[in-house]
């Protein structure tokens, strides 16, 4: 190497000037590329967040109550794709992305499916985000992808078979105060129970259960008046009574009214002294929804009927889709009677005849009268009623619906009773008595490990919910009356709760209620429990 060249090389090696510029020049390209990558990736991340928000909103909207997809799925009779939900999800996604720029080649896809009462929605997307700085290293775009999944439950379709005890014991006045009011004015069975009868004795035929000299506290034309009295103004009826110490109750009705009983109670009052009255001028009410009013005396069946009308309100407020619930009223004495069969029309008024609401409000009119051949008379045939209810559900055999579609409703039986089974029978009308009047229970006072009529229902998948309205102790007991049935009835009370618990689907399907408000609250709780358990089960 020539000497002058070696000199230049040596100088270059020893010279430290300009090193920063040279190093910067060497590192500039990768540094700028890194900064550019961060900017481009940040832009892509922001775009992905917008796309994800749109996907989340689309999935949720597709399954929201009252959305096209939700309503369409609720009407499907099987499982599969919910087309209306897919369309709705896509529309919501597109709407949320409308007006947003900064992406290309967007592809989105939605699926909405129904399986039983479960709904599932999935929204996926992919899009290209243009880049600026990354082009330096040959990258022309960033692709972002994502997915959103949502789930919901359809409201279950439920059928409610309200199996309602309307036997004589349900004619007990609804509260202690109402029982006192009735006992003070009721002439029925006064000779047997001089402290006063708290039941609205209800047998309608003359000489059927009440006679002037055999049972009554004063002459009643051989008719039972307890139920009639419970339906009229208490002050109005009291004002018809006159003092007469020759009768056990020390009272009497005007002779002209007695001879025309019971219709004379409602005939117009004629002018003149009370002793000459031939009409009472009273107006009967079909139901008594409030205790303590002068218009009537509330019976347990009135309280149950009012509670059922309130149940309809709860059902109407709770339904999420049209026709979600059907309810039927099935009272029983000896036979089960389809008083108002299953109906989806439960939003009527208690004052509108022809509606299930009106039928429920007037449930007390079905109290055992010994004239209704549909219900029969005498005793309380709970097991027979449950067997009959089973026959009404899906033909009486086989598995029942799971509530996932309108054509496969889940059936619930609501048994409302005081639980005292009595197998005696009285011919209709005004027939003779047959069978034992000794009270028992549906498990024969704990002699049966299970209750066959209840097990049949539960074995098919029917849910059985029980409302026990405690049978009231008879006090004092007249041991000479009706073969000492009062003693047997009292001794039976201890076995009732356990027997009804056996009937219920589980312990949380059993409730006890005594007062009118408790009865209303219990029925409301039973309905809400049915909704809750239907969701959990499915």
Regions found by a protein language model. Give the residues of each.
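P/S/T/G-enriched low-complexity
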Residues: 2-6, 10-11, 37-538
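Glycine-centered recognition micro-motifs in short, flexible terminal segments and loops
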Residues: 6-26
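Short glycine- and Lys/Arg-enriched binding-loop motifs that mark or flank ligand-binding interfaces
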Residues: 14, 32, 415
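Alpha-helical structural signal
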Residues: 19-22, 28, 56, 308
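Alpha-helical hydrophobic helix detector
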Residues: 25-39
